Amino acid sequence: MTSQPHAQSQGSHFFVLTVEKPGLASATSSGSYTPPPGATRLDAFNVLYAELTGSAPALNRANVVFFSLEPNQV
């Protein structure tokens, strides 16, 4: 384990987003994200949801099971 920070190569926030189409498909995405200045939590959610659900036709209009967006620092 190292104590060197790697925040410069990561976004300002860490997210986890899980969506599901009951009986068809589910997916989870996680990573770092830097919202543009003035963006809201809703703005970030909409971008992340569109990226995840746009990656597979089976996820179109999927239900959100879990969403977390927090500052990416310990």
Question: Where do the model's predicted regions map?
Answer:
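N-terminal acidic leader/helix
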Residues: T2-P37
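Compositionally biased, low-structure terminal segments
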Residues: F15-V16, N46, S68
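Prokaryotic Sec-type signal peptides and long signal-anchor helices
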Residues: T18-V19, Y49, P71
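Amphipathic, hydrophobic secondary-structure cores in small proteins
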Residues: A27-L52, P57
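Short, mixed-charge low-complexity intrinsically disordered segments
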Residues: T53-V74
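Generic "edge-of-domain/loop-turn" microfeature
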Residues: P22-L24, G38-T40, L69, V74
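Short intrinsically disordered terminal tails
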Residues: M1-H6, E70-V74
